């Protein structure tokens, strides 16, 4: 399984330095809003398969759209999710990590509208994250052809909601290849 690094990547030099440490993929988020060409630059240097764009979204009930946020979910970018993802693909992104930050860590289950959003982006691999409530839900989401992976945090780090840390692994056969 390839290891992906994300955080404070502001230049091709930053990305190259991390890859030289043995990391296969670079995930960028906030840096691309300051310099969208960073996607192309990293993709040209390291390859699109090593260029992961982390897209953090919040659902806007009034606009009935997912809006993209940067800076750990603190800053609205003005982009609607599909518009931003399409731009990232055009610039050379090879993979999208799409996170519903309203659901992240809540155990409420993934927002169905969020899953439908992912279905609209099928040109490159997409990993979904944010609110998975159970292994059964994870397996169900992974059955969609358009989902290449899931980001699971609390589900594999806690025994149950509001409980202490207890790393746990799904039993064999719960989530199939």
Residues covered by each model-derived region:
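C-terminal helical cap(s) of enzyme catalytic domains, especially alpha/beta-barrels
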Residues: 38-45, 138-177
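Catalytic cores of alpha/beta
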Residues: 2-5, 9-26, 113-150
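A cross-domain feature marking catalytic cores of carbohydrate-active enzymes
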Residues: 5-9, 30, 55-57, 100, ...
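Alpha-helix-loop-beta-strand connector modules within alpha/beta enzyme cores
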Residues: 1-4, 40-56, 108-134, 174-177
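Conserved anion-binding
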Residues: 19, 23-98, 102-103
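Short gly/pro/ser/thr-enriched loop/turn and capping motifs at secondary-structure boundaries
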Residues: 33-34, 60, 134, 156-159
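Short secondary-structure boundary/capping elements
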Residues: 6-10, 34, 76-80, 107-110, ...
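Short, well-ordered secondary-structure micro-motifs
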Residues: 16, 38-40, 63-67, 107-109, ...
């Amino acid at each position: 399984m390839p290891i992906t690094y994300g955080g404070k990547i502001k230049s091709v030099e930053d990305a190259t330095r991390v890859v030289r440490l043995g990391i296969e993929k670079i995930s960028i988020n906030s840096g691309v809003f300051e310099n969208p060409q960073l996607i192309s630059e990293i993709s040209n240097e390291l390859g699109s398969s090593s260029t992961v764009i982390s897209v953090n979204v919040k659902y806007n009930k009034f606009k009935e759209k997912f809006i993209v946020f940067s800076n750990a979910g603190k800053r609205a970018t003005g982009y609607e999710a599909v518009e931003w993802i399409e731009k990232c693909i055009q610039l050379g992104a090879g993979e999208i990590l799409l996170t519903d930050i309203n659901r992240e860590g809540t155990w409420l289950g993934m927002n169905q509208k969020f899953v439908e959003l992912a279905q609209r982006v099928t040109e490159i691999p997409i990993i979904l994250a944010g609110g998975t409530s159970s292994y059964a839900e994870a397996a169900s989401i992974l059955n969609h052809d358009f989902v290449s992976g899931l980001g699971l945090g609390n589900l594999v780090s806690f025994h149950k909601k509001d409980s202490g840390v207890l790393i746990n692994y799904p039993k064999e056969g719960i989530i199939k290849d």
